[in-house]
Swiss-Prot record:
Substrate binds at D90, S91, G92, G93, Y94, D152, Q194, G223. The keyword Metal-binding applies. Its EC number is 2.4.2.29. Belongs to the queuine tRNA-ribosyltransferase family. Pathway: tRNA modification; tRNA-queuosine biosynthesis. Keywords: Glycosyltransferase, Metal-binding, Queuosine biosynthesis, Transferase, tRNA processing, Zinc. InterPro entries: ArchSynthase1/Queuine_TRR, TGT, TGT-like_sf, tRNA_ribo_trans-like. This is Queuine tRNA-ribosyltransferase. The keyword Kinase does not apply. Binds 1 zinc ion per subunit. Homodimer. Within each dimer, one monomer is responsible for RNA recognition and catalysis, while the other monomer binds to the replacement base PreQ1. Its cofactor is Zn(2+). GO terms for cellular component: cytoplasm; cytosol.
Length: 378
């Protein structure tokens, strides 16, 4: 039912294929983020048209609203949202730990972490909840996502090394409990490698996580892209990838700027998710083959050329920069839709080209081409 096939490599960059009950995923893959059962400003039909293979759902947000009972009555998340391709759900842990920093809503919430689990107040009503590894698995089994994540403790940057080691041990303990709690055969679980920003802790995290290898379909690299310098992010990714099993998929959680994806692919990562393309679309920052466009700028006011002449998306085939700027400045809802179609297509097309380049052993050349594109601010 589930299988990962490593097709070929170019250096450490990997070209693979994941088989799931809801379809095949060609890797390396970018997964658009559908936090609340939808990718913001997109319809499923549009996601299909631009080549989306898999979307990500968020356990924390879906647990709060609409709630597990409604999704259960609907027959699972695929049926509830009418999406027949693969879905990956995260554990909600990152969101829960982010509550303490006031990342949702207008206030900071109380978050208490213990070896048992995490107690928190939600950002909607301020109600108290308690997530344990068992509960998080139970929620995701109700959702019926293809790929599940266990509860883990994600630390911030900077962090005390002693605490980072404590969080690592807790994450391993929670993984063991998640494996014991898992019942469904038609879903798979990834192990999450923490260890913060120290090579020795990352190595220890891999060693401890690998003890459960027979129960895990793949491995996630967590706790990065939380404010640390790029060289640390790339360094930790490299350390972990060198130690992970060759024949299982690797997922770098929450990392999604184009340059970061390319650097991680070069180090051996297969899967990515991030809100960057969709969030940037809603703030007017658009990626093109010529460079990055700020569509709000008055310089596009009378530019009647396509946003990106090399792009095959609906937006670029039909509309000019001048019109897209007008829609954005006028705060028309269609501006968010058209911008999001384009940014996601840029990402998905980039991944298509990455896969082809790995097959043809020219990944480094393609990487340099894209790095020049994203450095160029138009």
């Amino acid at each position: 039912m589930f299988k990962f096939h490593l097709i070929t490599k170019d250096g450490k960059a990997r070209r693979g294929r994941i088989y799931t009950p809801h379809g095949v995923i060609e890797t390396p893959v970018f997964m658009p983020v559908g936090t609340q059962g939808t990718v913001k400003a997109m319809l499923h039909k549009l996601l299909d048209e631009i080549g989306t293979q898999i979307i990500l759902g968020n356990t924390y947000h879906l647990y709060l609203r609409p709630g597990t009972e409604i999704i259960k009555k609907a027959g699972g998340l695929h049926r509830f949202i009418s999406w027949n391709k693969p879905i990956l759900t995260d554990s909600g842990g990152y969101q829960v730990f982010s509550l303490a920093k006031g990342k949702f809503g207008n206030r900071k919430a109380k978050v208490k972490v213990s070896d048992e689990g995490v107690e928190f107040q939600d950002h909607l009503q301020g109600d108290k909840h308690f997530f344990t590894p068992e509960k998080v698995v139970e929620i995701q089994e109700i959702f019926g996502s293809d790929i599940m994540m266990p509860l883990d403790e994600c630390v911030e940057y900077p962090v005390d090394k002693n605490y980072a080691e404590k969080a690592l041990k807790r994450t391993i303990n929670w993984l063991e409990r998640s494996i014991k709690a898992k019942k469904r055969e038609d879903q798979v679980l990834f192990g999450i490698v923490q260890g913060a920003f120290w090579k020795d802790l990352r190595k220890k995290a891999v060693e401890e996580t690998l003890k459960f290898d027979e129960f895990l379909f793949g491995y996630s690299i967590g706790g990065l892209s939380v404010g640390e310098p790029k060289e640390i992010m790339y360094g930790m990714t490299e350390v972990v990838c060198e130690l992970l099993p060759e024949k299982k998929p690797r997922y770098l959680m929450g990392v999604g700027k184009p340059e970061d994806i390319l650097e991680a692919v070069e180090r051996g990562v297969d899967m990515f998710d991030c809100v960057v393309p969709t969030r940037n679309a809603r703030t007017g920052t658009l990626y093109t083959s010529q460079g990055v466009v700020d569509i709000r700028h008055s310089k596009w006011k009378e530019d009647f050329s396509p946003l990106d002449p090399e792009c095959d998306c609906y937006t670029c085939r039909n509309f000019s920069k001048a019109y897209l700027r007008h829609l954005f400045v006028a705060e028309e809802i269609s501006a968010y839709v058209l911008n999001t179609i384009h940014n996601l297509r840029f990402y998905l097309k980039m991944m298509e080209e990455v896969r082809k380049a790995i097959e043809e052993k020219r990944f480094k050349e393609l990487k340099e081409k894209y790095l020049q594109r994203v450095k160029n601010k138009l």
